[in-house]
Amino acid sequence: MAFVLSLLMALVLVSYGPGGSLGCYLSQRLMLDARENLKLLEPMNRLSPHSCLQDRKDFGLPQEMVEGDQLQKDQAFPVLYEMLQQTFNLFHTEHSSAAWDTTLLEQLCTGLQQQLEDLDTCRGQVMGEEDSELGNMDPIVTVKKYFQGIYDYLQEKGYSDCAWEIVRVEMMRALTVSTTLQKRLTKMGGDLNSP
């Protein structure tokens, strides 16, 4: 019994210590999930993107905000979380269910949900009481406007197959940017609790 208690105490100390692996660290698993989600989007196309060129639109992906030095470390995590949450919301709708192969769509939504759950472990620790303030943070507002533009576009186009194909390609870009942001966070130290 004493051995088990000692083992549990050691695990707790390691988990919350500066080198703890159970703290808010961006894991390899998160990066693997991101790559897998990108791979799932590729075969979801029903049409050739070339057949939908007339429906192309620049949605204003905030790529320069994410890839440049505009985001501070304390802003990067909420932006990453918001991008993944909005991507999940987009593909977890009745309209998207009608547009895509159900199996691939379910796998994509499961992968996005897994990424969000992994990040959610850190979210409370990183965002804490500031959560309500972060909803009004300029980068978050920019991400929300970006996705609102996508929703508006789909509605304007009547959720057509070409509109969904354009959005699929755009979401591949968005997930690539999210992956870049995850890499930046890892380079910033990976520990989302450190200043």
UniProtKB/Swiss-Prot annotation:
Cystine pairs: 24-122, 52-162
Keywords, in A-Z order: Antiviral defense, Cytokine, Disulfide bond, Hormone, Pregnancy, Secreted, Signal
Chain segments annotated as coiled-coil in the UniProt record: none
Protein localization: Secreted
GO biological process, one term: defense response to virus
Tissue specificity as recorded in UniProt: Constitutively and exclusively expressed in the mononuclear cells of the extraembryonic trophectoderm.
Signal peptide: 1-23
One GO CC term on file: extracellular space
Predominant location category: secreted
SUPFAM superfamilies (UniProt xref): 4-helical cytokines (SSF47266)
GO molecular function: cytokine activity; cytokine receptor binding; hormone activity
Additional observations: IFN-tau genes are intronless. They evolved from IFN-omega genes in the ruminantia suborder and have continued to duplicate independently in different lineages of the ruminantia. They code for proteins very similar in sequence but with different biological potency and pattern of expression.
Role noted for this protein: Paracrine hormone primarily responsible for maternal recognition of pregnancy. Interacts with endometrial receptors, probably type I interferon receptors, and blocks estrogen receptor expression, preventing the estrogen-induced increase in oxytocin receptor expression in the endometrium. This results in the suppression of the pulsatile endometrial release of the luteolytic hormone prostaglandin F2-alpha, hindering the regression of the corpus luteum (luteolysis) and therefore a return to ovarian cyclicity.
Family: Belongs to the alpha/beta interferon family. IFN-alphaII subfamily.
Name of the molecule in the record: Interferon tau-9
Lineage of origin: Eukaryota, Metazoa, Chordata, Craniata, Vertebrata
